[in-house]
Amino acid sequence: MKVHNEAAVEAQITELRTITRLQEQCRALQIQGVKEKTAQNKATMGILRSNLRRGAQDWALAKKHDQWTISKACGKDTSMRLAHGRSTLEVAREKLRKYVFDRVNTHNILIHLVRRRGQKLESLQLELASLRNQPDATKDELRQLQIIRQLENNIEKTVIKITTSQNIHTLYKVLLDYLKKVLAEYPTELDKLQNLVANYCSELSDMTVMSQDAMMITDEVKRNMRQGEATFIEERRARENRLNQQKKLIDKIHTKETSEKYRRGRRDLDFPSNLMTMENVKVKKRKTSVADIQYQTKVTTLVERVKSAVQCSHLWDIAGRFLAQKNTEENLELQMEDCEERRTQLEALMKKLELEEAVLKFHQTPSAVGFNSIQKKMKNMLEEEEARLKQAQNNMNKGQQLLLVIQTGIDNLYIRLIGITLPTFQKEIAVSNTLDVYGKLDYCEGKLIYLAERMQTLSRNEEVDTKVRDTLESSTLKEKHNTRITFEDPEEDMIETFQFADVDHSYVPSRAEIKKQAQQLIEAKLKGAKKKKK
């Protein structure tokens, strides 16, 4: 079996070798054929290139010859030469042939006209000669000729009169038929006019009712606006009185603080050792880690970004601003829906009125003049009512803006006072998300009364005051909106923003500058006291 397998393998190997030899021979033959074909193609390419060059030269020569022939055919006519310069010889030849044929046709027509006129001239000359050769007529013949001409003229006049009378007779018949038809149609038109009169009367009554309703609505809106303005002015005056009282209290506190600072400065000068120890303690407290400083800078940058995005000067105003924006969005969406409904109603009314106007235009009668005058009056009344409605809408928009501003201020106060807890013996209002404006006002009023009472009852402590002042100054030192606040008169502007922004961009000194000024004053006073002692 092994010998048989080896023989079969050797036979297969020999067959494969013969196949590979044949494939190599075929490949060599293919390569030779390809080389021969490439050589033939190169030769044909050279021949074709030479033929192309010759053809291009022949084409250029033919073009030049065509241009020369066109210029020779056009002669001195530059416009024709420019018109046919870029075209081929065949196109130029066809155009010139058309031009020549047109000129030949016009020439033939003119020759024909000249011949006809010559024939007419010859006939007229012959008539002249015949008339000159005739003998002169007698008086009787002349009279007869005049009578004949008069009779011919009279006959023509009578014929014209007869034709005109016939035309008038037919016209009168047509008019009679038309008038009969119109008389037959008049009763139906009278019925239509009566119906139109009834419809117009009903529309007039409806329009009067509409105008009266609009007047009533505008009067009610004006009353509500006046009442709202009066209540707003009273509330604003009350708020301003409270703010003035608080301002007076703050001024008193500031005066006390300055006096206490002066006393402390004197004590520090009397006891320098105590001052050194206190300064060392403060320096130790101020030494903070680098991580805390980096965290504080990150927090401040984030807060500044939020403030710049929301356009608020305080952190506690951001939530109020978002709530105000939500309220304004909801109100604007409601207004948009109302406006769309009104627009659809007005479009339907406009279509109806346009249809009625078209009907009236195409069916106007002498009795419709009165309706036109009434319609003009009604249009004027409608324009006046629309102007009043626009004024009322403007007033309503102003009132809505004012209400939105008031709501934002109340929301800001509510958010500021929400963290203050009342004592147990006082009834605290439950905080809920569904509080209306009046509920928020009551809540803020209770908290503010509690805070005012607590401020009056609290005893002043120097250390606590200094700590609070230091924290406030350090927190508001780097703020851009760290400016003084001025209170405007109530008569200047009826709208209050409740956002105590940059009203008076006055200079606010820092804590270091205040310390320097205080030390300078203390040193000057001590020098004066030492000089007096000496």
Swiss-Prot record:
It comes from the Eukaryota. Residues 10-54, 136-209, 321-406 form a coiled coil. Disulfide bonds: none annotated. Keywords: Coiled coil. InterPro entries: CCDC183. PANTHER family: COILED-COIL DOMAIN-CONTAINING PROTEIN 183. This is Coiled-coil domain-containing protein 183.
